Amino acid sequence: MSSPAAQSNSSSSQSQSAAQQQQQQNQKANVNNTHDNKNAAATTGTAAGSGSGGAAGSAGTQQQGQGGTGTSSGPSSPTKRSTISTKERVIDSVAFPPSRKLTCADVFDARTGKPQHDVLKQHFILEGRIEESAALRIIQEGATLLRTEKTMIDIEAPVTVCGDIHGQFYDLMKLFEIGGSPATTKYLFLGDYVDRGYFSIECVLYLWSLKITYPQTLFLLRGNHECRHLTEYFTFKQECKIKYSERVYDACMDAFDCLPLAALMNQQFLCVHGGLSPEIHELEDIRRLDRFKEPPAFGPMCDLLWSDPLEDFGNEKNSDFYTHNSVRGCSYFYSYAACCDFLQNNNLLSIIRAHEAQDAGYRMYRKSQTTGFPSLITIFSAPNYLDVYNNKAAVLKYENNVMNIRQFNCSPHPYWLPNFMDVFTWSLPFVGEKVTEMLVNVLNICSDDELMTEESEEPLSDDEAALRKEVIRNKIRAIGKMARVFSVLREESESVLQLKGLTPTGALPLGALSGGKQSLKNAMQGFSPNHKITSFAEAKGLDAVNERMPPRRDATPSPAEEGQKSLSAAAAAAANANANSING
């Protein structure tokens, strides 16, 4: 058998000189050609011969394609390079979000004029959006309905009670799977539909569309996050501006002002977001409240949204009904005695509230001595809260005087960078690390004496020279420190993103980066430096700062607010005095 080069040349009618000339041209052309073009090689080999000769021709052409000379010398190993198409998505298994926004004609039924919530559901699951006009119409029509409802609404059983949602739209879909279709199930939501999660506007639009469609069987109460103060501080306002506009955000705030504050379920249960107030003694006190406003920093409306039961509820060390809520920075803690006193005075069985994350999704507190029923029930419906709590969620179904708790776990959801960060901002640490690394290397090339050299021939004194050298050294150290910060940001990007996700403003704790990996690790571990955030208690401890009422811009209260604050304090003191006299 002839050599591969000879086999290839034998199929050509060209002269020997022409073949040599062609071979030289191939050698010259292949100096810069390092790609393994197998398809072209196979085609050329087939044209060069058939059968075994064709295979030999193919081998010879492949060798020439790698820069070989076409001789019978040993073949060189091919250089393989992967190529990525710039016209196709790299991860094609993830569906691309719909690019077309739904119009009012798509969203609203032409016959009934009501939103098609099934259409919205499927569109939002795919991360689609709707036109601003459609979003505004849903929000405003929902607000019109909410405005007609009483401050404390009356609901008859059967009913399913749900706690905090916090923008976890995909878990809200799971909630309706567990609780039943809104078309056939009566629902009561206890507030906190927005903030912290990254799909808050989808939750609002979907729940409002359900409210418009089923106004007599779906009820929405106000939570402490349904206000301007918290949504500006946390994520909802930013989300509205990114996904829609500030006009949509303003419409949501106006709608939130219309939400009822409480519900009386089956004439037996008071349902509210937070809890009791020292200024609310009877149910009529709730009915008389003016709810159509931004919640104040203190007073009965604030307490209904912000108050909590004592941590040692049912095992208190003193007899006070109300104490200052140091965890929230506003409102009160209420005791077991205060709860039982309120229930007895209003002939109620229990208080059902939300407002606090629970490991199991719910908590039954100490039973009333008169009824034998839990005096207080907390329900929380956001599983794996903030993607770090690892808690279960729950809904409460009450029917035929039987209370049933149904738990559920979190559902997968699309990933957003913390605080809706874009990919360019996210990539800055990678770019910054390289820039500072280059700058440090440039500065390290020169010695201190070279950096001291100036055009001026005036000599510096020893003290001036030493001071100048120290200034230069400090600058190099500062740049080196900045380089370490960027290096930590790049290497520990996942930890940084998780820590940013736990802060409302997206700012990291001071010193978390400059101290290197260990300080970042300690910050991630929160209050337990020997453990990672793997338990519900540790996640709750780390997130406690975000459960407080954020500082207000107008920190100095108005005279009216001062008077209201004094009234609240006096009411709490009177309630505690009454409790002491009863116990005495």
UniProtKB/Swiss-Prot annotation:
Binding site for Fe cation: D164, H166, D192
InterPro entries in UniProt: Calcineurin-like_PHP_ApaH, Metallo-depent_PP-like, MPP_PP2B, PP2B, Ser/Thr-sp_prot-phosphatase
EC number: 3.1.3.16
Modified residues (Phosphothreonine): T61
Residue numbers binding Zn(2+): D192, N224, H273, H355
Reactions it catalyzes: O-phospho-L-seryl-[protein] + H2O = L-seryl-[protein] + phosphate; O-phospho-L-threonyl-[protein] + H2O = L-threonyl-[protein] + phosphate
GO biological process: calcineurin-mediated signaling; sleep
Region (Disordered): 1-89, 546-584
Enzyme type, top EC level: hydrolase
Biased composition (Gly residues): 48-57
GO MF annotation list: calmodulin binding; calmodulin-dependent protein phosphatase activity; metal ion binding; protein serine/threonine phosphatase activity
Cofactor: Fe(3+); Zn(2+)
Pfam family, one: Metallophos
Active site: H225 (proton donor)
Alphabetical keyword list: Calcium, Calmodulin-binding, Hydrolase, Iron, Metal-binding, Phosphoprotein, Protein phosphatase, Zinc
PANTHER family per the UniProt record, alphabetical: SERINE/THREONINE-PROTEIN PHOSPHATASE 2B CATALYTIC SUBUNIT 1-RELATED
Subunit and partners: Interacts with sra in a complex that contains Pp2B-14D.
Protein's UniProt name: Serine/threonine-protein phosphatase 2B catalytic subunit 3
